[in-house]
């Protein structure tokens, strides 16, 4: 049991005097589930430890980067060696090219790569690049898809925006918002209509490879392929955001499981992709890449400006190289099996408690949506229409049993290569009580 949290409470009280809401990223405040956020002080393998000494099996995994488990020895060794050489040089380093080569080998759609520091910076640069390359202004995004907190893409965004039930963000000007067309996800007819009306001024369509920020939503059959065909027909670019799914859902990301798979019956290729999370191995780094002719529009070879003091930071590059080097196909196969085991156990527990639900998948990522078994979740409207009130009691029951879940129903669950039988059994043991708590919840 983890009900004793006096130190966490003290830390949160102090943090609220120093930082907006006491956090540096809104979802950490437990706003949609209530209670005291946990302040973590250490992590090892599949486990987290909070400031009160409570241990949790971790199903957040740093929102994806801890693919190998926390504090993996090879990653720590690489980071320690890099730190010994210096933290930042303001110049290029060998591991930038080493990491780029690994990404390009795994994702053949990437012909050039630019390192940045955050996923938001990657998508921001991709959008600017698309506008510069095409000479057009409008961007199509999909309701519920989250692409970081750049102004033009916050309308009807998922992730923390969905968690806080916000339509977008204050501070985004009408002029900026007017350059973004927000369409329903999984609706190719709406995309075709938008191009019929605005096609000559649409620079790009940006989409998550598989959305995981309104809960996990599987792209409908032919949806991503259709986006590729429509954009090419109209001279626009397709930007596929794999900040979350890249090298997390599979060896080559979600694109590698679908349109880029060797046995794909209907292959499709994005013009640009964005990456983050896993490629930094827990350190802050991200990247954008894609067609050489498009990427070469970036400075210094082209007129689209992008720069960053810490882009390609040597410590982050070392962590990324070590993580992807050890993220073998066997690692993904192992996580795939664990994901199926956990999702099956979750569904069985909810069924036994009489809780209507559906479980949504994107590779080894999944999430649960309550009250949706009849139709599943195909877009943002479906996600918002679920019985979200059942998640908070479910979450807190799991937390009390020592399992740390995402503190929002709109986020994916993550497993790692370090989740062994002992860790999985602790999760399985906690599920029946949590399912009963969800069943008893009143909306």
UniProtKB/Swiss-Prot annotation:
EC nos: 5.4.3.8
Organism classification: Bacteria, Bacillati, Actinomycetota, Actinomycetes, Micrococcales
GO cellular component term, pick one: cytoplasm
Pathway: Porphyrin-containing compound metabolism; protoporphyrin-IX biosynthesis; 5-aminolevulinate from L-glutamyl-tRNA(Glu): step 2/2
GO molecular function list: glutamate-1-semialdehyde 2,1-aminomutase activity; pyridoxal phosphate binding; transaminase activity
Subunit structure: Homodimer.
UniProt cross-references to InterPro entries, sorted A to Z: 4pyrrol_synth_GluAld_NH2Trfase (IPR004639), Aminotrans_3 (IPR005814), PyrdxlP-dep_Trfase (IPR015424), PyrdxlP-dep_Trfase_major (IPR015421), PyrdxlP-dep_Trfase_small (IPR015422)
Compartment(s) of residence: Cytoplasm
Enzyme class: isomerase
Catalysed reactions listed for this entry: (S)-4-amino-5-oxopentanoate = 5-aminolevulinate
Organism listed in the record: Pseudarthrobacter chlorophenolicus (strain ATCC 700700 / DSM 12829 / CIP 107037 / JCM 12360 / KCTC 9906 / NCIMB 13794 / A6)
CDD domains: OAT_like
UniProt protein name: Glutamate-1-semialdehyde 2,1-aminomutase
Primary residence: cytoplasm
């Amino acid at each position: 049991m983890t009900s004793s949290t006096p130190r966490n409470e003290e830390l949160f009280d102090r943090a609220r005097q120093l930082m907006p809401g006491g956090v540096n990223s809104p979802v950490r405040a437990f706003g949609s589930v209530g209670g005291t956020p946990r302040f973590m002080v250490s992590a090892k393998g599949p486990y987290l430890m909070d400031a009160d000494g409570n241990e949790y099996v971790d199903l957040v995994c740093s929102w994806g980067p801890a693919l190998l488990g926390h504090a993996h020895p090879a990653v720590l060794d690489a980071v320690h060696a890099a730190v010994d050489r210096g933290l930042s040089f303001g110049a290029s380093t060998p591991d930038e090219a080493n990491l780029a080569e690994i990404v390009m080998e795994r994702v053949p759609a990437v012909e050039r790569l630019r390192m940045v520091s955050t996923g938001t910076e990657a998508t921001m640069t991709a959008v600017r690049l698309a506008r510069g390359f095409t000479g057009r202004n409008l961007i199509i995004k999909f309701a519920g898809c989250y692409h970081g907190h750049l102004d033009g893409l916050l309308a009807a965004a998922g992730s923390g925006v969905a968690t806080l039930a916000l339509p977008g963000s204050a501070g985004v000007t009408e002029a900026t918002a007017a350059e973004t067309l927000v369409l329903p996800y999984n609706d190719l007819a709406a995309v075709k209509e938008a191009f019929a009306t605005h096609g000559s001024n649409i620079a790009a369509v940006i989409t998550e490879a598989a959305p995981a920020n309104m809960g996990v939503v599987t792209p409908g059959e032919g949806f991503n392929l259709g986006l590729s065909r429509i954009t090419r027909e109209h001279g626009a670019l397709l930007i596929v955001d794999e900040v979350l799914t890249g090298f997390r859902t599979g060896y080559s990301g979600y694109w590698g499981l679908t349109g880029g798979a060797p046995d794909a019956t209907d292959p499709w290729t994005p013009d640009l992709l964005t990456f983050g999370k896993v490629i930094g191995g827990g350190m802050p780094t991200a990247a954008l890449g894609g067609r050489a002719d498009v990427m070469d529009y970036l400075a210094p070879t082209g007129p689209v400006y992008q720069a960053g003091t810490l882009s390609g930071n040597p410590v982050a590059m070392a962590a990324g190289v070590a993580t992807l080097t050890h993220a073998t196909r066997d690692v993904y196969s192992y996580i795939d099996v664990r994901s199926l085991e956990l999702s099956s156990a979750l569904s069985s527990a909810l069924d036994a408690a009489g809780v209507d639900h559906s479980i949504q998948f994107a590779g080894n990522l999944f999430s649960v949506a309550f009250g949706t078994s009849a139709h599943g979740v195909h877009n943002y409207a479906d996600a918002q229409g679920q019985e979200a009130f059942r998640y908070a009691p479910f979450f807190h029951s799991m937390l009390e049993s020592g399992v740390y879940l995402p503190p929002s129903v709109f986020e994916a669950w993550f497993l790692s290569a370090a989740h062994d039988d002992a860790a999985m059994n602790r999760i399985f043991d906690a599920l029946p009580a949590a399912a009963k708590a969800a069943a008893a919840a009143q909306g």
